[in-house]
Amino acid sequence: ATVPAGTSVYQQPAVQYQQYQPYQTVVQSQPQQVVAGRVVPAVYPATVGSQVYPSGVVPATVYNSGIVRNVYPAGVVPAVAGAYQYFPTD
C-alpha cells in the first residue's frame, strides 16, 4: 500500500477512535488501580457473568480467567485525549 506524502503509516483514521468509550473526564479525575496486572479505572465496575465487582476488588483468579468486562490490559497507552481502548470479552 502506498502512503500519501506528509502522512505516517502509524496514523490511523479518526473514525476508528469513535468505537472507543469516552472515559476522558472520569479517568482523569479519578485514580486508577492496578489489579492482577490490569489497569482499571477506579470508578468503573467489572462485570463477571451476573456478578458485579467494584473495580479494584475483583479476585486475581477472575481477572486471569479473561472473562472480565471493562478491564484494560496493563500498559495500554490512551488512544486519544485520555480515552482508553475498550476490550469487550463477550
UniProtKB/Swiss-Prot annotation:
GO terms for molecular function: structural constituent of cuticle. Keywords: Cuticle. Component of the cuticle of migratory locust which contains more than 100 different structural proteins. This is Cuticle protein 9.5.
